[in-house]
Swiss-Prot record:
UniProt propeptide residues: 22-74
Disulfide feature: C75-C90, C82-C95, C89-C110
Primary location class: secreted
Organism: Cyriopagopus hainanus
Name this protein carries in UniProt: U11-theraphotoxin-Hhn1a
GO cellular component terms, A-Z: extracellular region
Length: 113
């Protein structure tokens, strides 16, 4: 009976000691991973502002190339009265005489082509 107790005690001691070793090993691995993660975060934190500055520079460069005259002037939407001589309907719309509605107010409206 003593041999059984000694055997179980020996197995128990080995299991505890190996379990503790595994726990220490996993703790070390976690520390290494967090240190690597921190280095990746530092790298990303340094890279992000650089990318943002590059994008901002490109956008500002494009804005400076455009002149005020190259922008599209305000246009009139669909179903809005327009002037026959100076139609400012948006792209895809044409200034036409209405068929039914609007004949009482103005003579021309913007319609789809």
């Amino acid at each position: 009976m003593n041999t059984v107790r000694v055997t179980f005690l020996l197995v128990f001691v080995l299991a505890v000691s190996l379990g503790q070793a595994d726990k220490d090993e996993s703790r070390m691995e976690m520390q290494e991973k967090t240190e690597q993660g921190k280095s990746y975060l530092d790298f990303a934190e340094n890279l992000l502002p650089q990318k943002l500055e590059e994008l901002e520079a490109k956008l500002l460069e494009e804005d400076s190339e455009e002149s005020r005259n190259s922008r599209q002037k305000r246009c009139i939407g669909e179903g809005v009265p327009c002037d026959e001589n100076d139609p400012r309907c948006c792209s895809g719309l044409v200034c036409l005489k209405p068929t039914l509605h609007g004949i009482w107010y103005k003579s021309y409206y913007c319609y789809k082509k």
